[in-house]
A protein has these predicted regions:
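Terminal targeting signals and extreme-terminal segments of soluble enzymes
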Residues: 1-80, 95-99, 103-162
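Short, charged beta-turn/beta-strand-edge "cap" motif at the junction between a beta-strand
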Residues: 90-93
Length: 162
């Protein structure tokens, strides 16, 4: 992991191409596949931005995160072979919990989908929740970009203007 002093809060960004095998017969990204695109993008972003590989972390420590809740809105279809912009940010962090907001946009910046994902930190061997280490909590506190809206639909209204 990068030194915490070298990390600053930011919205993480990447791009993805909507692939054939992920689409329905109408050439739209299948609703179930949005989660895969969001999670894959987030994992890659965290690895690139913070040099933090969650799979190495899990293998080395026996700890990891499980999804406890997702809220997702599908606003505009993502189309076969379309390039989309993926954004994510940590919006909330507590000792055993993090919430991440992820957005899929077209190349003009228009919102296609919004996801709030909540994760619980767990000891995989004991199947019990566990507090983040001081080092992880310090990282999360440093990179967290809280949002004003605490309700998903209110946030959707703010982001989906125009």
């Amino acid at each position: 992991m990068k030194s915490i002093k070298d990390i600053s809060p930011e919205i993480l960004r990447s791009t993805a191409i909507i692939r054939f095998q992920d689409c329905d017969p109408y050439a739209h990204l299948n609703n179930g596949r949005y989660l895969d695109y969001f999670m894959n993008a987030r994992e890659d972003m965290v690895w690139k931005a913070y040099d933090f590989n969650i799979y190495d972390y899990s293998r080395e420590t026996g700890l990891g995160w499980v999804v406890s809740q997702n809220q997702i809105a599908y606003l505009r279809p993502a189309i076969l072979m379309e390039e989309v912009i993926m954004e994510s940010q940590l919006t909330e962090s507590r000792p055993k919990f993090i919430q991440v907001e992820m957005r899929m946009l077209d190349t003009a910046g228009k919102l296609k989908s919004l996801l709030w994902a909540q994760f619980i930190h767990v000891d995989i061997r004991k199947a019990k929740s566990i507090a983040h280490s001081d080092e992880l909590q310090e990282l999360f506190d440093k990179v967290c970009l809280p949002i004003a809206e605490k309700d998903f639909n209110d946030r959707l209204k703010v982001l989906n203007v125009g």
